[in-house]
A protein has these predicted regions:
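Auxiliary Fe-S-binding modules of radical SAM enzymes
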Residues: 1-22, 233-311
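Iron-sulfur cluster-binding cysteine motifs and their immediate structural context
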Residues: 38-45, 64-84, 94-110
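Extended, non-globular alpha-helical segments
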Residues: 54-60, 108-123
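Conserved dinucleotide-binding and phosphotransfer motif residues
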Residues: 102, 158, 300
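Conserved AdoMet/S-adenosylmethionine-binding subsite of the radical SAM
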Residues: 114-262, 267, 272
């Protein structure tokens, strides 16, 4: 099977995105991520396999899903609505196919490159007018490196620029190969925490490979100017003065120039609940501390800094 005919699970394709790279963009969210960030805003994208979303508020109480479920995994609570026994459910999706109220639906859809482009290339005129394009995100796009490479090549034939959104946790050679493609104009590189103990505690993996890959891209003349560092900021976790200053020193060492600060938000809590999980709630930095972090990067380190999603 060629990469052109291959397919991946796509969680969603978000049109008119303005915070996933420059200009107006279409963001493609690929399913599967090796990290398990406790504050993840797309937790339904972590598992590489298909999952079933349950939205009790949409349930009309017809009971049809209960009748057709071959695993007897669905029940109806008079007060809480529809309930799925995740230990019994085998994600056959028979219920989702029959639920026109959309109380049950799959997290993702299997899509080929042509199917992705059929949607993404619809807005080319907006990309051209705003300096936008397509952003490949996740999950973690490196999980599907070969597929992403083929997608980028097909996008190039249509004269559309690509932005890669990555945690940097993956094969360095594969990342560099993607990043060096002429059609890739921007790389959004996540910096969860420079402290490895904190990183392991809150993402489930070491940051050693992430920092090595970041240094590689920052020191490569073909990719260094494409880098945008993205820093999710969680109060008391990765926003301490020690961590912020260590991060800034590392940025100076490798020559990083552009930084996006992303204060924590709790949008992932309901998404996690809808796939049967529970996500801890955190807090963003105070407005005062966020401003100090911004000023540190901007006025002391002379970096190009912006804050996204500021409340």
């Amino acid at each position: 099977m060629s990469n052109q005919s291959a397919s991946v699970l796509v969680g969603s394709i978000q049109k008119f995105s303005v915070e996933d790279g420059p200009g107006i963009r279409t963001t493609v969210f690929l399913k599967g991520c090796p990290l398990s960030c406790k504050w993840c805003h797309n937790p339904e994208m972590i598992d590489a396999g298909q999952q079933l979303i349950s939205s009790p508020n949409n349930c009309i109480g017809c009971g049809h899903c209960i009748q057709i479920c071959p695993q007897n995994a669905i029940s109806l609570d008079p007060e809480k609505g529809i309930h799925i026994d995740r230990n019994t459910c085998n994600v056959c999706l028979k219920c989702a196919k029959e639920c026109y109220a959309q109380a049950l639906r799959p997290v993702a859809k299997e899509m080929t490159i042509d199917e992705i482009l059929a949607t993404a290339e619809q807005d080319k005129r907006f990309y051209d007018h705003t300096g936008g394009g397509i952003t490949v995100s996740g999950g973690e796009m490196l999980t599907h490196a070969d597929f992403v490479g083929s997608l980028i090549d097909e996008v190039a034939k249509r004269g559309i620029h690509v932005c890669l959104d990555t945690s940097g946790f993956g094969d360095g050679k594969a990342l560099q190969k993607l990043a060096r493609k002429e059609n890739v104009t921007d790389i959004l590189y996540d910096m969860k925490a420079i402290d490895d103990e904190v990183h392991q505690a809150y993402t489930g993996v070491s940051n050693k490979r992430i920092l090595e890959n970041l240094r590689m891209l920052a020191e490569d003349p073909e990719t260094s100017e494409k880098l945008w560092l993205r820093m999710p900021l969680v109060q008391g976790v990765n926003d301490t003065e020690e961590i912020i200053r260590s991060t800034g020193e590392f940025y100076q060492e490798i020559g990083v120039k552009k930084v996006n600060l992303l204060p924590y938000h709790n949008l992932g809590i309901s998404k996690e609940r809808n796939v049967g999980g529970v996500q801890e709630e955190f807090q963003p930095p105070s407005e005062e501390w966020l401003t100090k972090i911004e000023n540190y990067f901007k006025k002391e380190l002379y970096l190009d800094v912006s804050i996204l999603g500021r409340v």
